[in-house]
């Protein structure tokens, strides 16, 4: 049995990638920039500094990325405070399962601590987590393993005794490089041929992930 469970957040715990995409699509339509979901998919799992460069490359050096990112975040916060946060199937079950089994739980996300803590609070899952590792806590974003190695360290565990739960390609690369058991629950992105050998368990949802971990 694993001793630690390390969760990505957006797209894995919460159906927030779609909210972010819808905000960007709405803003880009309003401001007259051609935009589509395929470009957005390329940004999934990357840190904002990387995404910033992608937008400049696509839309020009004068593209006001940070202005739009701030506006998008404000729209996002307003939405989840008003409507709540969309929780992925099986999230409460898997957190309860690990907590009841004595497994330590950490968050490993490229999202800011402020937004991460707000998401956890609104979903009422903050108390399940023994450690949070957020975007500003590491120098290197996924696919570098730093975020997962830091999560294991904060849990006081060897990474090899932990399972990482991810929905993104970069996330799986990061967790695999950290030496963790990897569990992929795809959201926007399906596993590529490159990362399939890196995936220990490929699951439809977090309920199936419980079964896979329990039976492994």
Residue ranges and their predicted role:
Residues 1-42:
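Active-site neighborhood of HAD-like aspartate-dependent phosphohydrolases
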Residues 34, 104, 181:
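Residue-level detector of anion-binding/catalytic polar loops
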Residues 27-28, 47-61, 119, 151-152:
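Helix-loop "lid/cap" segments that line or gate small-molecule binding pockets
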Residues 33-41, 60-69, 159:
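Short, surface-exposed acidic
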Residues 55-93, 101-103:
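Metal-dependent phosphoesterase signature
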Residues 19, 46-47, 86-90, 111, ...:
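Short beta->alpha linker loops
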Residues 13, 87, 105-108, 140, ...:
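Conserved SAM-binding loop
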Residues 1-3, 96-99, 112-216:
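Asp-based, Mg2+/Mn2+-dependent phosphohydrolase catalytic module
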